[in-house]
């Protein structure tokens, strides 16, 4: 199954979460997203979606905002500490898994709570981690969410 992984602002392709997904057996599409401008990152992601047709889109931090800004073309969403508010992305999404930590020092957990209040199709998973979301149990939770999407 194809999974599009959209990395965060200070990350790059081939990071911990993308590697974990690949090791779990997924075909991981992991394009390099520029730091600026945001709309170019969205265009790159949309082009990959249009051409590769991934089944699941996983976005981390800024990549989560990018994932919320694209037309997923039927792909399921898994958002990791999505920085939607910082990038002015719409608060309306039909359904998604969101993994976030109340200890996040970059993207406030209250932003995820606000998303949940406005979108009842969301499943929020609170992780005992920091913003980087690299602990083994967090990586396993991300993989579990992607596995749930593939059912």
Name what the model sees in each region.
Residues 1-52:
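Active-site catalytic motif of lipid deacylating hydrolases and related acyltransferases
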Residues 14, 105-114, 134:
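Conserved alpha/beta-hydrolase "acid-adjacent" motif
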Residues 42-43, 111, 134-149:
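Post-His helix in hydrolase/transferase enzymes
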Residues 57-68:
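Gly/Ala-rich beta-loop-alpha elbow adjacent to hydrolase catalytic centers
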Residues 73-85:
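A conserved short beta-strand
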Residues 97-104:
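Short beta-strand/loop motif that positions the catalytic acidic residue
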Residues 117-134:
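Catalytic histidine neighborhood in serine/cysteine hydrolases
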């Amino acid at each position: 199954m194809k999974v599009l992984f959209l990395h965060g602002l200070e990350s790059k392709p081939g990071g911990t979460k993308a590697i974990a997904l690949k090791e779990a057996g997924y075909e991981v599409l992991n394009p390099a997203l520029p730091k600026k401008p945001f709309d170019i990152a969205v265009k790159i992601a949309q082009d990959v979606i249009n051409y590769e047709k991934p089944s699941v889109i996983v976005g981390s931090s800024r990549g989560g905002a990018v994932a919320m800004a694209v037309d997923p073309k039927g792909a399921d969403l898994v958002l990791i500490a999505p920085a939607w508010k910082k990038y002015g992305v719409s608060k309306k999404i039909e359904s998604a898994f969101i993994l976030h930590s109340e200890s996040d020092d970059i993207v406030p957990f209250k932003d995820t709570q606000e998303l949940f209040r406005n979108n009842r199709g969301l499943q929020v998973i609170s992780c005992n981690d920091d913003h980087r979301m690299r602990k083994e149990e967090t990586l396993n939770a991300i993989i579990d969410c992607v596995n749930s999407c593939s059912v």
